Amino acid sequence: MTSGESKTGLKNVYPSAKKLLPKVEEGEAEDYCTPGAFELERLFWKGSPQYTHVNEVWPKLYIGDETTALDRYGLQKAGFTHVLNAAHGRWNVDTGPDYYRDMAIEYHGVEADDLPSFDLSVFFYPAAAFIDAALRYDHNKILVHCVMGRSRSATLVLAYLMIHRNMTLVDAIQQVAKNRCVLPNRGFLKQLRELDRQLVQQRRQAQQGEDAEKCEQEP
Protein backbone atom coordinates (compact mmCIF):
# COMPACT_ATOMS: atom_id res chain seq x y z
CA MET A 1 0.00 0.00 0.00
CA THR A 2 1.47 3.33 -1.08
CA SER A 3 1.44 6.46 1.02
CA GLY A 4 -1.41 7.87 -1.08
CA GLU A 5 -3.72 4.92 -0.54
CA SER A 6 -5.74 3.74 2.42
CA LYS A 7 -7.12 0.36 3.36
CA THR A 8 -10.52 1.43 2.04
CA GLY A 9 -9.11 2.52 -1.31
CA LEU A 10 -9.90 6.21 -0.94
CA LYS A 11 -7.21 7.30 -3.38
CA ASN A 12 -9.12 6.66 -6.58
CA VAL A 13 -12.45 8.21 -5.68
CA TYR A 14 -11.56 11.91 -5.53
CA PRO A 15 -12.26 13.39 -9.00
CA SER A 16 -11.43 16.90 -10.08
CA ALA A 17 -13.82 19.39 -8.50
CA LYS A 18 -14.37 21.16 -11.82
CA LYS A 19 -16.12 18.08 -13.20
CA LEU A 20 -18.70 18.21 -10.41
CA LEU A 21 -20.19 21.63 -11.04
CA PRO A 22 -23.63 21.58 -12.69
CA LYS A 23 -24.46 23.43 -15.86
CA VAL A 24 -25.88 26.83 -15.09
CA GLU A 25 -29.38 27.41 -16.40
CA GLU A 26 -30.87 30.81 -17.16
CA GLY A 27 -33.20 31.30 -14.22
CA GLU A 28 -35.72 28.96 -12.67
CA ALA A 29 -38.85 28.11 -14.59
CA GLU A 30 -41.84 29.94 -13.16
CA ASP A 31 -44.00 26.87 -13.65
CA TYR A 32 -41.67 24.56 -11.69
CA CYS A 33 -43.63 22.14 -9.53
CA THR A 34 -42.14 19.74 -6.99
CA PRO A 35 -42.38 16.22 -8.48
CA GLY A 36 -43.92 13.26 -6.70
CA ALA A 37 -41.90 10.60 -4.89
CA PHE A 38 -41.93 8.11 -7.77
CA GLU A 39 -40.68 10.70 -10.26
CA LEU A 40 -37.89 11.67 -7.86
CA GLU A 41 -36.88 8.04 -7.36
CA ARG A 42 -36.53 7.67 -11.11
CA LEU A 43 -34.02 10.51 -11.06
CA PHE A 44 -31.93 8.58 -8.54
CA TRP A 45 -32.06 5.44 -10.64
CA LYS A 46 -31.16 7.21 -13.87
CA GLY A 47 -27.44 7.14 -14.52
CA SER A 48 -26.39 6.44 -10.94
CA PRO A 49 -22.76 5.27 -10.76
CA GLN A 50 -21.73 1.98 -9.19
CA TYR A 51 -21.74 2.01 -5.39
CA THR A 52 -18.39 2.79 -3.74
CA HIS A 53 -17.35 3.72 -0.21
CA VAL A 54 -17.11 7.47 -0.80
CA ASN A 55 -17.69 9.99 -3.60
CA GLU A 56 -17.26 13.70 -4.12
CA VAL A 57 -20.71 15.06 -5.02
CA TRP A 58 -19.89 18.77 -4.89
CA PRO A 59 -16.47 20.45 -4.74
CA LYS A 60 -14.90 19.52 -1.38
CA LEU A 61 -18.15 17.82 -0.26
CA TYR A 62 -18.20 14.02 -0.02
CA ILE A 63 -20.81 11.42 0.85
CA GLY A 64 -19.48 8.22 2.36
CA ASP A 65 -20.26 5.21 4.49
CA GLU A 66 -19.32 3.85 7.90
CA THR A 67 -16.13 2.26 6.57
CA THR A 68 -14.91 5.62 5.33
CA ALA A 69 -15.73 7.39 8.60
CA LEU A 70 -13.90 4.81 10.70
CA ASP A 71 -10.75 4.93 8.57
CA ARG A 72 -8.82 7.60 10.46
CA TYR A 73 -5.70 7.02 8.38
CA GLY A 74 -7.61 7.41 5.13
CA LEU A 75 -9.38 10.56 6.28
CA GLN A 76 -6.12 12.15 7.35
CA LYS A 77 -4.34 11.25 4.11
CA ALA A 78 -7.27 12.57 2.06
CA GLY A 79 -7.18 15.87 3.95
CA PHE A 80 -10.63 15.88 5.51
CA THR A 81 -11.19 18.71 7.97
CA HIS A 82 -14.87 18.18 8.85
CA VAL A 83 -17.09 15.14 9.46
CA LEU A 84 -20.88 15.19 9.66
CA ASN A 85 -22.18 11.89 11.02
CA ALA A 86 -25.84 11.47 10.07
CA ALA A 87 -25.97 8.20 12.03
CA HIS A 88 -24.52 9.42 15.32
CA GLY A 89 -25.22 7.33 18.39
CA ARG A 90 -24.43 4.16 20.27
CA TRP A 91 -26.52 1.92 18.03
CA ASN A 92 -25.38 3.50 14.75
CA VAL A 93 -21.90 4.80 13.86
CA ASP A 94 -20.60 5.48 17.35
CA THR A 95 -17.70 7.83 16.67
CA GLY A 96 -18.14 11.35 18.02
CA PRO A 97 -15.59 14.12 18.65
CA ASP A 98 -13.42 11.86 20.83
CA TYR A 99 -12.88 9.44 17.96
CA TYR A 100 -11.12 12.21 16.03
CA ARG A 101 -9.68 14.03 19.06
CA ASP A 102 -6.03 13.76 17.94
CA MET A 103 -6.87 14.83 14.38
CA ALA A 104 -7.57 18.25 12.89
CA ILE A 105 -11.22 17.34 12.25
CA GLU A 106 -14.33 19.23 13.35
CA TYR A 107 -17.22 16.88 14.10
CA HIS A 108 -20.98 17.31 13.97
CA GLY A 109 -23.33 14.47 14.89
CA VAL A 110 -26.98 13.93 13.99
CA GLU A 111 -28.82 11.14 15.80
CA ALA A 112 -31.10 9.86 13.08
CA ASP A 113 -32.71 6.55 12.20
CA ASP A 114 -33.13 5.48 8.59
CA LEU A 115 -36.88 5.05 8.94
CA PRO A 116 -39.63 6.70 6.86
CA SER A 117 -41.31 7.77 10.11
CA PHE A 118 -38.22 9.60 11.42
CA ASP A 119 -38.34 13.40 11.17
CA LEU A 120 -34.96 14.31 9.70
CA SER A 121 -36.22 17.72 8.58
CA VAL A 122 -35.51 19.24 12.01
CA PHE A 123 -31.81 18.77 11.22
CA PHE A 124 -31.90 20.23 7.69
CA TYR A 125 -30.89 23.77 8.57
CA PRO A 126 -28.34 23.00 11.34
CA ALA A 127 -26.62 20.38 9.16
CA ALA A 128 -26.68 22.67 6.13
CA ALA A 129 -25.15 25.46 8.20
CA PHE A 130 -22.33 23.15 9.33
CA ILE A 131 -21.59 22.12 5.75
CA ASP A 132 -21.76 25.70 4.51
CA ALA A 133 -19.40 26.94 7.22
CA ALA A 134 -16.89 24.23 6.32
CA LEU A 135 -16.97 25.02 2.60
CA ARG A 136 -16.35 28.73 3.08
CA TYR A 137 -12.63 28.00 3.13
CA ASP A 138 -10.93 26.43 0.13
CA HIS A 139 -8.60 24.26 2.19
CA ASN A 140 -11.48 22.50 3.97
CA LYS A 141 -12.96 19.18 2.93
CA ILE A 142 -16.05 17.63 4.50
CA LEU A 143 -17.33 14.07 4.72
CA VAL A 144 -21.06 13.54 5.31
CA HIS A 145 -21.75 9.93 6.16
CA CYS A 146 -24.19 7.48 7.70
CA VAL A 147 -23.95 3.68 7.66
CA MET A 148 -24.24 3.05 3.92
CA GLY A 149 -23.97 6.61 2.66
CA ARG A 150 -27.19 6.32 0.72
CA SER A 151 -30.16 7.69 2.70
CA ARG A 152 -29.56 9.83 5.79
CA SER A 153 -26.31 11.44 4.64
CA ALA A 154 -27.61 11.94 1.11
CA THR A 155 -30.76 13.62 2.43
CA LEU A 156 -28.75 16.15 4.45
CA VAL A 157 -26.50 16.92 1.49
CA LEU A 158 -29.52 17.43 -0.75
CA ALA A 159 -30.99 19.81 1.82
CA TYR A 160 -27.70 21.75 1.90
CA LEU A 161 -27.66 22.16 -1.88
CA MET A 162 -31.26 23.37 -1.81
CA ILE A 163 -30.81 25.78 1.11
CA HIS A 164 -27.38 27.24 0.42
CA ARG A 165 -26.88 26.63 -3.32
CA ASN A 166 -30.38 27.69 -4.37
CA MET A 167 -31.08 24.42 -6.16
CA THR A 168 -34.49 22.90 -6.64
CA LEU A 169 -34.87 19.36 -5.35
CA VAL A 170 -34.64 18.09 -8.91
CA ASP A 171 -31.39 19.98 -9.51
CA ALA A 172 -29.93 18.74 -6.23
CA ILE A 173 -30.82 15.11 -6.95
CA GLN A 174 -29.32 15.29 -10.42
CA GLN A 175 -26.14 16.82 -8.99
CA VAL A 176 -25.68 14.14 -6.34
CA ALA A 177 -26.96 11.12 -8.28
CA LYS A 178 -24.54 11.62 -11.15
CA ASN A 179 -21.66 11.24 -8.71
CA ARG A 180 -22.93 8.69 -6.18
CA CYS A 181 -25.47 5.90 -5.92
CA VAL A 182 -27.94 7.18 -3.31
CA LEU A 183 -31.62 6.70 -2.50
CA PRO A 184 -33.26 8.35 0.54
CA ASN A 185 -36.22 6.49 1.99
CA ARG A 186 -39.77 7.57 1.13
CA GLY A 187 -40.21 9.47 4.38
CA PHE A 188 -37.08 11.54 3.79
CA LEU A 189 -38.16 12.21 0.21
CA LYS A 190 -41.47 13.53 1.51
CA GLN A 191 -39.61 15.88 3.85
CA LEU A 192 -37.34 17.06 1.03
CA ARG A 193 -40.37 17.70 -1.16
CA GLU A 194 -41.85 19.89 1.56
CA LEU A 195 -38.56 21.80 1.88
CA ASP A 196 -38.52 22.22 -1.89
CA ARG A 197 -42.02 23.71 -1.93
CA GLN A 198 -41.13 26.12 0.87
CA LEU A 199 -37.91 27.31 -0.77
CA VAL A 200 -39.46 27.71 -4.22
CA GLN A 201 -42.28 29.77 -2.71
CA GLN A 202 -39.79 31.96 -0.83
CA ARG A 203 -37.77 32.59 -3.98
CA ARG A 204 -40.84 33.46 -6.01
CA GLN A 205 -42.00 35.90 -3.35
CA ALA A 206 -38.55 37.47 -3.23
CA GLN A 207 -38.53 37.81 -7.02
CA GLN A 208 -41.99 39.37 -7.01
CA GLY A 209 -40.79 41.87 -4.42
CA GLU A 210 -37.79 42.79 -6.55
CA ASP A 211 -39.98 43.18 -9.64
CA ALA A 212 -42.42 45.42 -7.76
CA GLU A 213 -39.56 47.57 -6.50
CA LYS A 214 -38.21 48.00 -10.02
CA CYS A 215 -41.63 49.08 -11.27
CA GLU A 216 -41.88 51.71 -8.53
CA GLN A 217 -38.47 53.10 -9.46
CA GLU A 218 -39.33 53.49 -13.13
CA PRO A 219 -40.29 57.07 -14.17
From Swiss-Prot:
Gene3D superfamilies registered for this protein in UniProt: Protein tyrosine phosphatase superfamily
Subcellular localization: Cytoplasm; Nucleus
Enzyme class: hydrolase
Keywords recorded for this protein, A-Z: Cytoplasm, Hydrolase, Nucleus, Protein phosphatase
GO BP term, pick one: protein dephosphorylation
UniProt cross-references to InterPro entries, sorted A to Z: Atypical_DUSP_subfamA, Dual-sp_phosphatase_cat-dom, Prot-tyrosine_phosphatase-like, Tyr_Pase_AS, Tyr_Pase_dom, TYR_PHOSPHATASE_DUAL_dom
Recorded superkingdom: Eukaryota
Binding site for substrate: H145, C146, V147, M148, G149, R150, S151, R152
Keyword Transit peptide in annotation: no
Assembly description: Homodimer. Interacts with PRKAA2.
Protein name: Dual specificity phosphatase 29
Organism of derivation: Bos taurus (Bovine)
